[in-house]
Amino acid sequence: MSRKPIIAGNWKMNKTAAEAREFIDAVKNNIPSNNLVDTVIGSPALFLEGMKKGVKGTELQVAAQNCYWEDFGAFTGETSPAALAALGVDYVIIGHSERRDYFHETDQEINKKAHAIFKHKMTPILCCGESLETYEAGKTAEWIEGQITADLKGLSAEQVSSMVIAYEPIWAIGTGKSADANIADDICGVVRATVEKLYGKEVAQAVRIQYGGSVKPENVAEYMAKENVDGALVGGASLQADSFLALLDFVK
């Protein structure tokens, strides 16, 4: 099965509203056709409304970096999935290692977020990944299988087929280190095998799996050439318009 590539930038807690507008203006009319690749920017919640207005009429898509699992209520500081959907947000990143580590998010909470995102007809980008200790102990496959199984609990085959799963080795995020393309392909293969075990081969062949971890314009093509890697979730290299556009050169 041919899966359309997806390149998603994750700005994390960076940029002002003016800088976000400047980036969008530089990028939105210079990306490849979405017949070839889905191009997504994950923005801080503050800028999402402006981002959606800025990309209107173009093929650049917008992701939120997080949401809560309840639509509305007394949840100070949280972001409503219903409100994101009303803005027209396309994707929501959930389960990022920084959310799991710094904010102690659990697989059970991430699972509730996935259900909420699908309820509002957005697409989750579900992150999974292991620590250096787990990797060096040879327990990566076991760890990833446990995360994926818990995070997908109760989702339908149709939902899982349409979502994006991002493998991000924690030891490679923002460190300048990266899992080489063969390791990334192997672990993305573990993700796919776990989905197959849970949902069957057809779903496993449909779900798109990204690699995230110090992806740069210089190495993105090497990852994208691998059988189980369908895209990249990119942090630092997505912050500047020129480097973000260079990430998309692999489709040429």
UniProtKB/Swiss-Prot annotation:
It is found in: Cytoplasm. SUPFAM superfamilies: Triosephosphate isomerase (TIM). Keywords: Cytoplasm, Gluconeogenesis, Glycolysis, Isomerase. The lineage of its organism: Bacteria, Bacillati, Bacillota, Bacilli, Lactobacillales. Its main location: cytoplasm. This is Triosephosphate isomerase. Homodimer. Gene3D superfamilies: Aldolase class I (3.20.20.70). Its EC number is 5.3.1.1. The keyword Isomerase applies. Transmembrane segments: none annotated. One of its GO terms (biological process) is glyceraldehyde-3-phosphate biosynthetic process. Involved in the gluconeogenesis. Catalyzes stereospecifically the conversion of dihydroxyacetone phosphate (DHAP) to D-glyceraldehyde-3-phosphate (G3P). One of its GO terms (molecular function) is triose-phosphate isomerase activity. One of its GO terms (cellular component) is cytosol. It is an enzyme of class 5 (isomerase). The active site is at H96 (electrophile), E168 (proton acceptor). It comes from Streptococcus mutans serotype c (strain ATCC 700610 / UA159).
